[in-house]
């Protein structure tokens, strides 16, 4: 399966709006207790999450996994920092990217592949306000073109 394939659980739609995504990496996640049950139930939010390289390891911050309903006292902290599993070579590349000004690591998708939870991590450069406006204009123009084609097809 190519990167980003598998049963999609959550997607960070805002990431493509806020960042130019240049490269993607597939990473495993170190989970505790009932977290995988909540993930399989789809109770995950990637909205404000980001990844950081700390002491040669990659950690995912602010990813919200809701507590499992039947988990009682074994439940986890919903916003805890989670370690990501990557090859050393990939981590070294990410260190190089994050040292450059303006680059950040953003989770794009969370999915289950072969029974394991995976995160598609994107290396992104923040968009300025005018870049966002330009993207919106381009999308609107594309919609107008498609609408005109559909009107032509009806006649």
UniProtKB/Swiss-Prot annotation:
UniProt keyword Cytoplasm, yes or no? yes
What the entry lists under SUPFAM superfamilies is as follows: Small protein B (SmpB)
- One GO-annotated biological process of the protein: trans-translation
Supply the alphabetized keyword list: Cytoplasm, RNA-binding
> Which GO terms label this protein's molecular function in UniProt?
RNA binding
The compartments listed are: Cytoplasm
Q: Does the keyword RNA-binding apply?
A: yes
A Pfam family annotated for this chain is SmpB
Annotated S-S bridges: none
Alphabetical GO CC annotations of the entry are: cytosol
Q: Which family does it belong to?
A: Belongs to the SmpB family.
The protein, known as: SsrA-binding protein
Organism equals Geobacillus sp. (strain WCH70)
């Amino acid at each position: 399966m190519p990167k980003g394939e598998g049963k999609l659980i959550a997607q960070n739609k805002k990431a493509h709006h806020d960042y130019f995504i240049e490269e993607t990496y597939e990473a495993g996640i170190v989970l505790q207790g009932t977290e995988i049950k909540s993930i399989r139930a789809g109770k995950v939010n990637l909205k404000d999450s980001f990844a950081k390289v700390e002491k040669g390891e990659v950690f995912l911050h602010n990813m919200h996994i809701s507590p499992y309903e039947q988990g009682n006292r074994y439940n986890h902290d919903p916003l805890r920092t989670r370690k990501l599993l990557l090859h050393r070579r990939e981590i070294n590349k990410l260190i190089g990217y994050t040292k450059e000004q303006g680059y950040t690591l953003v989770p794009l998708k969370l999915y289950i592949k072969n029974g394991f939870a995976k995160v598609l991590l994107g290396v992104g450069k923040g968009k300025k306000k005018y870049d966002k406006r330009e993207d919106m204009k381009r999308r609107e123009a594309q919609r107008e073109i498609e609408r005109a084609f559909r009107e032509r097809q009806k006649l």
